[in-house]
Amino acid sequence: MYTLTQFGFREMMDCRTRIRAIFNDDPATLAEAGERVVKFFYEGLLDDTGKPACALVRMFKTHRFSDLDPQSRAVALRALPDAETVPDLRCLTLLATAGDQPEWNQVANSRAHRVIPLPTEAMVERAPMIAQLITQLGGKISNVLRPDPNLLFDTKDATYNLFYVPRAVGSPFIVSQKEFVEAYRIASVLGFGGLLASGDFFAAILFSHIPITSQVADLFKVVGMNLKVAFLPLARRPLFKA
């Protein structure tokens, strides 16, 4: 466990090692892998009193609409009724969630973020946080909506491995200010992830009660890169149990 206000180089090195080992016991599904990740960060990052430093930790991954399980497909269709007509539609899918509120600990309880269809760049740009998350972690929105295998390992991708909102209050990237940021005392937001060999995009997002300094955020670039390395072999696992 790590006290977030005291997270330094030593803690980063230890966290990096633990992240690389998080999937040693092979997860059967992407959801199981995501559950390990959100639990690791929610339970492992603490404030100065020993309580969870994060109000909420979530993990997302893009998935082809045609490859979604029936329940997830139904959720996508409610959000985008003509989803079946969009060629090779990608959906940002909530793999796992852990947080302070009981309803934040079950994917099925998520109303707005369980499955988010991403039909066009214009529609993605209307969701500021998703657009910024993709831009910071995936390089270009077009790379996520229409993956090009020739670009997946572009060296530029290595620089887009951190999404950082130092002050959540008033941030244009977090639209739900009163209902979420103010109500649950969100101070900073940190995200890491990127593009996988499958062409899919993934991200772990931490909504912290305590301010995260730029120095601490920089250390999580290494943590995020190691999470990506650990997650790479799992990219083609089934989303959920059949």
Language-model segments: residues:
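Sensory beta-strand/linker motifs that couple input domains to effectors
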Residues: 198-208
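Helix-to-coil/beta transition segments that act as allosteric "coupling" elements at the rims
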Residues: 121, 127-146, 152-200
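Intrinsically disordered, low-complexity terminal regulatory regions
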Residues: 1-157, 209-242
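Short, charged/polar micro-motifs that form catalytic or ligand-binding hotspots
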Residues: 20-28, 167, 180, 184, ...
